[in-house]
């Protein structure tokens, strides 16, 4: 896929119980594959000022993935900074036309918007890629996953050193930090 977007992540994941007790099932939103929906702040889709950009949806085996682009409004720019800084890492969807079983398994629906939220209802809905473009003409990329430690250093530098556990002498051990991989 060759398209420009500011970040991407899971709009919703299958087979996880959401905060409302519903469980999205495989291909529940397959009709939304390839559709573009508004990207909004915290499901507040009743005012134009809450529209932060748009999300291109991709139905996958594990759920619906979203490629999101911010608009140039003040709200869009502010939200972009929140995402780039890792202050917001969760996504959520608003959908209607739901078909569900008596046990609250969602088997069909239509996604109407993707929201940036402080805490999502679906535990698997989060941002996992942020395009950190710098104005110097070069693209910088990173993958951010919620609740994982981040270590940053330049490619021409050695990774930061860590203090040896229990040494107490404050000397650094000549061993790079574990970057969580």
Give each language-model segment a name:
Residues 24-25, 46, 72-74:
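Short, surface-exposed beta-strand-loop junctions and turns on beta-sheet-rich folds
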Residues 35-46, 91:
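Short conserved beta-strand and strand-loop elements enriched in small hydrophobics
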Residues 4-9, 14-20, 38, 54-155:
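Residue microenvironments linked to proteolytic maturation
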Residues 47-51:
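C-terminal (or distal) subdomains of carbohydrate-active enzymes
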Residues 20-32:
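Short Gly/aromatic-enriched secondary-structure transition segments
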Residues 143-181:
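Intrinsically disordered, compositionally biased, charge-dense segments
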């Amino acid at each position: 896929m060759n398209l420009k977007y500011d970040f991407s992540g899971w709009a919703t994941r299958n087979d996880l119980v959401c905060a409302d007790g519903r469980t999205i099932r495989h291909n529940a939103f397959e009709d939304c594959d390839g559709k573009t929906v508004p990207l909004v702040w915290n499901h507040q889709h009743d005012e134009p000022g809450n529209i932060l950009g748009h999300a291109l949806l991709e139905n996958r085996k594990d759920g619906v993935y979203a490629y999101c682009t911010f608009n140039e409004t003040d709200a869009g720019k502010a939200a972009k900074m929140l995402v780039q800084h890792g202050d917001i890492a969760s996504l959520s969807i608003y959908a209607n036309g739901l078909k569900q079983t008596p046990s609250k398994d969602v088997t069909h629906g239509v996604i109407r918007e993707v929201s940036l939220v402080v805490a999502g209802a679906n535990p698997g809905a989060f941002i996992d890629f942020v395009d950190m473009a710098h104005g110097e003409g070069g693209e910088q990329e990173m993958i951010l996953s919620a609740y994982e430690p981040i270590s940053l250093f330049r490619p021409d530098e050695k990774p930061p050193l860590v203090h040896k556990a229990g040494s107490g002498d404050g000397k650094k051990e000549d061993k790079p930090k574990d970057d969580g991989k």
